[in-house]
């Protein structure tokens, strides 16, 4: 009977739960879904991570290749993210060129990388003016159940922490690059940006980590990306109902706690992986 | 038929330094707005902020493709064309921001199963482009007579490395700044409708408060420009 009511009046069904300060899946308004992360599962990629936020699953693979730097930045490498939302993850996506959602997510991840300075592009330089590393970060969503931006940011961070670049020397006689696959080193990750997404309901209520259905019923969304010093890398609010300054401050404090949780989880996973 | 209105909006009195047109306080550049300049769209507006200029045209409410129609509201579409080159992923991201902002204010339920299309063309970019696009879109929607629950305006601010806030930054100020924040605020309660930020910063409250104060000037400019237009005819 409840299922019938849910189909006919989804918003009313939802409001009944919100009145009791909880959600249909039993979570509180400020509670995140269970987050699990698996690092280093793809052996063919230089770095990889799989993140599950409840049902939302995103896998990130990082491949490093050589490239010639551009003339106006001869000592800077490139980090090229791409988010793919294939028809596999949800019925709303069709096959073909990337839709708007995928493009917006790709631009968001590119902005986070650029704003947070997660990797110093100068670290990716092998020989100024001649050879630099380019890191292709491919994020593929395997299951879309809302809050794709948080999952993608986490997957990207975990994968970059897993990337090992081999040592490259330029042979002076032949001017060719020699790759020493036996000597690999991790990337220097300077900051750890963590995203926290909120959905706005009925212009007043804010809930954390919306599922797919909640995102559909929400009147607005907000994503805050914070690094460990409490600095904001990105305050992404793509329209939707208005928010007052006070509500914004509440969201920021929630984002700070989330950052601590995520960082702890990631440190645990990396520590458990080290003896290889 | 055309109305051109200019105004100088200032928040604090300038010190009158000759080298930079604005002091380290908060003041907006010279605004200008021209409405109803294109003959084909239902509404059009050109918004100028200093040297940044955006032309907006609105078609709607018009017929919508069955695949895109929503049974109880109007379908809003935003197309943003850059000055040079083909539209890319960055334009798609901006289109989404502008579209969601417009969806929050436009009363779509009055025109179900129709489409409202906002087309924006960047004429020149000298900083604060997203804010200028938002202002142009709002003026064009007003010119087209699309019912809205509030007006909205875009305000950009830049934070440089020593923490000073500059409103409505030029391209040079944007490049040198530590962070550039663009906000869209509504006219009724000055609530935050849209926010898009670039760079690393920690003080949102101060920027938001400054943007809210600046938005008063922008809304006053809207009101004056519309009053002047309708009082003559």
From Swiss-Prot, chain A:
UniProt-recorded name of the protein: Exosome complex component RRP43
Chief localization: cytoplasm
Key words of the record: Acetylation, Cytoplasm, Disease variant, Exosome, Neurodegeneration, Nucleus, RNA-binding, rRNA processing
Family stated for the protein in its record: Belongs to the RNase PH family.
N-acetylalanine sites (modified residues): 2
Any single Pfam family the record assigns to this protein: RNase_PH_C
Alphabetized SUPFAM superfamilies for the sequence: Ribonuclease PH domain 2-like (SSF55666), Ribosomal protein S5 domain 2-like (SSF54211)
Highest taxon of the lineage: Eukaryota
InterPro entries cross-referenced by the UniProt entry: ExoRNase_PH_dom1 (IPR001247), ExoRNase_PH_dom2 (IPR015847), ExoRNase_PH_dom2_sf (IPR036345), Exosome_comp_Rrp42_subfam (IPR050590), PNPase/RNase_PH_dom_sf (IPR027408), Ribosomal_Su5_D2-typ_SF (IPR020568), Rrp43 (IPR033196)
GO MF term set: identical protein binding; mRNA 3'-UTR AU-rich region binding
Job of this protein: Non-catalytic component of the RNA exosome complex which has 3'->5' exoribonuclease activity and participates in a multitude of cellular RNA processing and degradation events. In the nucleus, the RNA exosome complex is involved in proper maturation of stable RNA species such as rRNA, snRNA and snoRNA, in the elimination of RNA processing by-products and non-coding 'pervasive' transcripts, such as antisense RNA species and promoter-upstream transcripts (PROMPTs), and of mRNAs with processing defects, thereby limiting or excluding their export to the cytoplasm.
Stored CDD domains: RNase_PH_RRP43
UniProt disease link: Pontocerebellar hypoplasia 1C: A severe autosomal recessive neurodegenerative disease characterized by cerebellar and corpus callosum hypoplasia, abnormal myelination of the central nervous system, and spinal motor neuron disease. Affected individuals manifest failure to thrive, severe muscle weakness, spasticity and psychomotor retardation. Vision and hearing are impaired.
A single Gene Ontology CC term: nucleus
Subcellular location: Cytoplasm; Nucleus; Nucleus, Nucleolus
Keyword RNA-binding: yes
Gene Ontology terms describing biological process: exonucleolytic trimming to generate mature 3'-end of 5.8S rRNA from tricistronic rRNA transcript (SSU-rRNA, 5.8S rRNA, LSU-rRNA); nuclear mRNA surveillance; nuclear polyadenylation-dependent rRNA catabolic process; RNA catabolic process; RNA processing; rRNA catabolic process; TRAMP-dependent tRNA surveillance pathway; U1 snRNA 3'-end processing
Record's subunit section: Component of the RNA exosome core complex (Exo-9), composed of EXOSC1, EXOSC2, EXOSC3, EXOSC4, EXOSC5, EXOSC6, EXOSC7, EXOSC8 and EXOSC9; within the complex interacts with EXOSC5 and EXOSC6. The catalytically inactive RNA exosome core complex (Exo-9) associates with the catalytic subunit EXOSC10/RRP6. Exo-9 may associate with DIS3 to form the nucleolar exosome complex, or DIS3L to form the cytoplasmic exosome complex. Exo-9 is formed by a hexameric base ring consisting of the heterodimers EXOSC4-EXOSC9, EXOSC5-EXOSC8 and EXOSC6-EXOSC7, and a cap ring consisting of EXOSC1, EXOSC2 and EXOSC3.
């Amino acid at each position: 009977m409840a299922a019938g009511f849910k189909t006919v009046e989804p918003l009313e069904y939802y409001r009944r739960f919100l009145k009791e300060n909880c959600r249909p899946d039993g979570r509180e308004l400020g509670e995140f879904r269970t987050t699990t992360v698996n690092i280093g599962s793809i052996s063919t990629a230089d770095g990889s991570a799989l993140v599950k936020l409840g049902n939302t699953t995103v896998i990130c693979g990082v491949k490093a290749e050589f490239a010639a730097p551009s003339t106006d930045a001869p000592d800077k490498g490139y980090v090229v993210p791409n988010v793919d939302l294939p028809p596999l993850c949800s019925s709303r996506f069709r096959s073909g060129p990337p839709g708007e959602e995928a493009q917006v997510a790709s631009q968001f991840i590119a902005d986070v990388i650029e704003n947070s300075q997660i990797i110093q592009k100068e670290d990716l330089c092998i020989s100024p003016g001649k050879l630099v590393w380019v890191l292709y970060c491919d994020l593929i969503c395997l299951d879309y159940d809302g809050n794709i931006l948080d999952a993608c940011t986490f997957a990207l961070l975990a994968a970059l922490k897993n990337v090992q670049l081999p040592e490259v020397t330029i042979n002076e006689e032949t001017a060719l690059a020699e790759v020493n696959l036996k000597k690999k080193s991790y990337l220097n990750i300077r900051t750890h940006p963590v995203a926290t997404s909120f959905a706005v309901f009925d212009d007043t209520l804010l809930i954390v980590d919306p599922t797919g259905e909640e995102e559909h019923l929400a009147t607005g969304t907000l994503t805050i990306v914070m690094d460990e010093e409490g600095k904001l890398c990105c305050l992404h609010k793509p329209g939707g109902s208005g928010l007052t300054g006070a509500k914004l401050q509440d969201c920021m404090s929630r984002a700070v706690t989330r950052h601590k949780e995520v960082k702890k989880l990631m440190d645990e996973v990396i520590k458990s992986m080290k003896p290889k | 038929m055309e109305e051109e209105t200019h105004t100088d909006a200032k928040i604090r009195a300038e010190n009158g330094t000759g080298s930079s047109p604005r002091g380290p306080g908060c003041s907006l550049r010279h605004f200008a707005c021209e409405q109803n300049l294109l003959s084909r769209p239902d509404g059009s507006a050109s918004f100028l902020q200093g040297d940044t200029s955006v032309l907006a045209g609105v078609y709607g409410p018009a017929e919508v493709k069955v695949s895109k129609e929503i049974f109880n509201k109007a379908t809003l579409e935003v197309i943003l064309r850059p000055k040079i080159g083909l539209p890319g992923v960055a334009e798609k991201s901006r289109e989404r921001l502008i579209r969601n902002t417009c969806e929050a204010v436009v009363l779509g339920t009055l025109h179900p199963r129709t489409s409202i299309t906002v087309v924006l063309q960047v004429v020149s970019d000298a900083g604060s482009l997203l804010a200028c696009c938002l202002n142009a879109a709002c003026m064009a929607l007003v010119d087209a007579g699309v019912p809205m629950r509030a007006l909205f305006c875009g305000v950009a601010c830049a934070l440089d490395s020593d923490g000073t806030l500059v409103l409505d930054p030029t391209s040079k100020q944007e490049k040198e700044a530590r962070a550039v924040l663009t906000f869209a605020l509504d006219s009724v309660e000055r609530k935050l409708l849209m926010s898009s930020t670039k760079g690393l910063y920690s003080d949102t409250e101060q920027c938001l408060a400054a943007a809210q104060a600046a938005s008063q000037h922008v809304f006053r400019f809207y009101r004056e420009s519309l009053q002047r237009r309708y009082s003559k005819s």
